[in-house]
């Protein structure tokens, strides 16, 4: 059963081949047997899941119509609210916070008969690219337990890779869906800004954040987006971009012109560069034409991103002060102590580093030098993409300059920030992007291929990703070496 896609599991429930309860039980068995070595989940919601599964099975028995996600097990990143469950953001600051409402994406999942299994680990407040910054435990990469799974949605990527669920929700502020997807050999999709409601997502960078799915195959991205996408009046930034179905769009003709920023590929490791150009050749053989585009301004994207993201994070996280929200230190005996001691004890080092950076670039003395200048360069990045799209339909890039690295191999914060060089620009420019598995590094670790589209043309991005998947034959990758559980039995 672990080899089935979300769409195949849904069809099994609809046909009566399997029940939603049996599917939920099977995947909980996998999680309880295997997740102790991976650490993908922070919490499970078995009672809620089995209640939902029983409702679905009763619908089947009565012959009632079923939702698009009927019986599909889904994991939720722990910065997305599920009413009555903890939303910790993998932080001591919110360790005991119980969400009072459901996020819009959670409402839409359950309205379409999806079965939510639990909350997934992440870098604290989504700040990081390793999922080693969780306050509770690190997550390991199913392809190599000594390697990081990427981040900040590392728990989501690891859960899908290890087949704990066929769909997981993540959030992407600067690559936090796509980079872990590439590291763990799964598909990760960042929709256009505003395509999926952010209501119920704990904000990191409000002009950058976007919720999206991680799956084993592109077809399941399309299935998920047909549920998640759409305007939501509770999120002022949400828009209605799409009229047709994502699933139907996969069968349409693939765009013919693919732009490649050749001048932006110098930092790639040799085997990663070779894999990228081999991936382009697969699309060329299907009739696409490669054209060079000028995106050299993206050399500044990481600097701009960390100015903008840190400024927005400092503002968004100001509410977590031990008074309005979050951990209050028992050592605090005055208002000043509550603010200072609670935040020092409640936040991890990386979160504090970014809050300090954000407050610095927003300070009166430095705002013009950093924040306003960074915002101006962001506008030029958007213009550069617009000009590039005059020559092509979509743009292709690697996801990362290297495969997953060992835990502790990169400790310098600046070096870790540079890991985002091929992903942050899409968030700065509000663009949709998909990461699909494209093969393996010389160490045998997964690599990813990234397709970026114009804002609102998410379906076109998925078309190209699907075409690449089908013609490369690289799909449904499974790290057999790290799992003992096969078909419900421990081997």
Curated annotation (Swiss-Prot):
Cellular compartments per GO CC: glutamyl-tRNA(Gln) amidotransferase complex
UniProt keyword annotations, A-Z: ATP-binding, Ligase, Nucleotide-binding, Protein biosynthesis
Protein name as catalogued: Glutamyl-tRNA(Gln) amidotransferase subunit A
Task of the protein: Allows the formation of correctly charged Gln-tRNA(Gln) through the transamidation of misacylated Glu-tRNA(Gln) in organisms which lack glutaminyl-tRNA synthetase. The reaction takes place in the presence of glutamine and ATP through an activated gamma-phospho-Glu-tRNA(Gln).
Assembly and binders: Heterotrimer of A, B and C subunits.
Organism: Chlamydia abortus (strain DSM 27085 / S26/3)
GO molecular function list: ATP binding; glutaminyl-tRNA synthase (glutamine-hydrolyzing) activity
Signal peptide range: none
UniProt cross-references to Pfam families, sorted A to Z: Amidase
HAMAP family named among the record's database cross-references: GatA (MF_00120)
Enzyme class, first EC level, given as a word: ligase
Active site, renumbered: 77 (charge relay system), 152 (charge relay system), 176 (acyl-ester intermediate)
InterPro entries listed in its UniProt record: Amidase, Amidase_CS, Amidase_dom, AS_sf, GatA
Catalytic activity: L-glutamyl-tRNA(Gln) + L-glutamine + ATP + H2O = L-glutaminyl-tRNA(Gln) + L-glutamate + ADP + phosphate + H(+)
Enzyme Commission numbers on file: 6.3.5.7
GO biological process: translation
Family from the record: Belongs to the amidase family. GatA subfamily.
């Amino acid at each position: 059963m672990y080899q089935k896609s979300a769409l195949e599991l849904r069809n099994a429930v609809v046909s009566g081949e399997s029940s939603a309860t049996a599917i939920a039980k099977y995947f909980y068995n996998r999680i309880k047997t295997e997740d102790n070595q991976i650490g993908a989940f922070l919490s499970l919601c078995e009672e809620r899941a089995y209640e939902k599964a029983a409702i679905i099975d009763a619908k089947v028995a009565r012959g009632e119509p079923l939702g698009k996600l009927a019986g599909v097990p889904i994991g939720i990143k722990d910065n997305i609210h599920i009413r009555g469950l903890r939303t910790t953001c993998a932080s001591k600051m919110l360790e005991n916070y119980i969400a009072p409402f459901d996020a819009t994406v959670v409402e839409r999942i359950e309205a379409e008969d999806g079965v939510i299994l639990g909350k997934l680990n992440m870098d604290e407040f989504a700040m990081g690219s390793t999922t080693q910054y969780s306050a509770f435990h690190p997550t390991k990469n199913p392809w190599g337990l000594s390697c990081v799974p990427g981040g900040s949605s590392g728990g989501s990527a690891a859960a899908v890779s290890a087949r704990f669920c066929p769909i997981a929700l993540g959030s992407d502020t600067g690559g936090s869906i796509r980079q872990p997807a590439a590291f763990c050999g799964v598909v990760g999709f960042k929709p256009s800004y505003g395509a999926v409601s952010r209501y119920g997502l704990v904000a990191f960078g409000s002009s950058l954040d976007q919720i999206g799915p991680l799956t084993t195959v592109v077809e399941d991205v399309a299935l998920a987006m047909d549920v998640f996408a759409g305007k939501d009046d509770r999120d002022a930034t949400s828009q209605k971009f799409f009229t047709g179905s994502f699933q139907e769009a996969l069968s349409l003709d693939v765009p013919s012109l693919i732009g490649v920023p050749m001048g932006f590929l110098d930092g790639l490791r040799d085997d990663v560069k070779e894999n990228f150009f081999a991936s382009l050749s697969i699309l060329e053989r299907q009739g696409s034409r490669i054209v060079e585009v000028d995106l050299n301004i993206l050399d500044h994207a990481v600097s701009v991103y960390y100015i903008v993201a840190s400024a927005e994070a400092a503002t968004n996280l100001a509410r977590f002060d031990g008074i309005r929200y979050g951990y209050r230190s028992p050592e605090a005996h005055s208002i000043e102590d509550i603010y200072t001691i609670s935040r020092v004890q409640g936040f991890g080092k990386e979160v504090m580093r970014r809050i300090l950076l954000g407050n610095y670039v927003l300070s009166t003395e430095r705002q013009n030098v950093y924040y306003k200048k960074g915002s101006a360069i962001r506008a030029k990045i958007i213009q550069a993409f617009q000009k590039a799209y005059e020559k092509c339909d979509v743009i292709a890039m690697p996801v990362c300059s290297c495969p997953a690295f060992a835990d502790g191999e990169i400790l310098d914060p600046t070096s870790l920030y540079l890991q985002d060089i091929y992903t942050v620009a899409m968030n700065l420019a509000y663009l949709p992007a998909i990461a699909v598995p494209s093969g393996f590094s010389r160490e045998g670790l997964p690599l990813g291929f990234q397709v970026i589209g114009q804002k609102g043309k998410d379906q076109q991005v998925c078309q190209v990703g699907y075409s690449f998947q089908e013609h490369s034959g690289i799909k449904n990758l499974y790290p057999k070496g790290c799992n003992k559980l096969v078909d419900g039995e421990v081997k």
